[in-house]
Amino acid sequence: MSVVFKDPNAYKGRVYCFHNEPVQRDVMGYKVAGVSKGDVIPQGTPLVANDNDTNGQKTAKIAKYAKVKAKTSTTVFELENIGFLAVGDKIFKSGATDPTLSTISKIEGNVITLSEANSQLAAGDIVVEGKTVETAGGEGAPSGDTPVTVVVPKDIPNRIVARTETMTTLNQTISATHQAIAIKNVLDYPEEWLNAETFPGSVLLKGCPLILFINQ
């Protein structure tokens, strides 16, 4: 089934996600995996891009996240927009100290049901697709080399979709940017994707430091 966004060019019904329009676009576009004919990919969608894959092509996939609109129970949540999240995806609360990774077992419209309870999530929170990794003696690990399992984002985006695109063919390419000024409080990206230490009051995209986020 195609993914259709209402008012795809604007976020929150009134604001564009870039400080200057039109935003600078990369030369040529990216073939995006995991999308279908008829899907609408909004401006501001985060991408994990590869400028030269094993076939010598420019390819990308969508980094998944969403904002919680309402909480029905510890397993049922309404999102502001389901975006490209799918059944089977694992998500966690952005910014949580010890995040719980939960699997999406059901989707109805913008309402998701989790296969296990997640008491950390509430209205206004950002959820991001995640995975577990083992660390030893590094960040998140106790002293010594005892392995610990931590939850981290599945993807760190390095491009942002430059303009809204509707997929008319499966081989269609998507315009993206690696150099832009984006509006942080419009896109609501997870903090795990951002570097907040470079400029006071603004941040950079971890995967691409030429994309600057400002509050407006």
Region locations from a protein language model:
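Surface-exposed, low-hydrophobicity beta-strand/loop segments enriched in small/polar/acidic residues
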Residues: M1-Q216
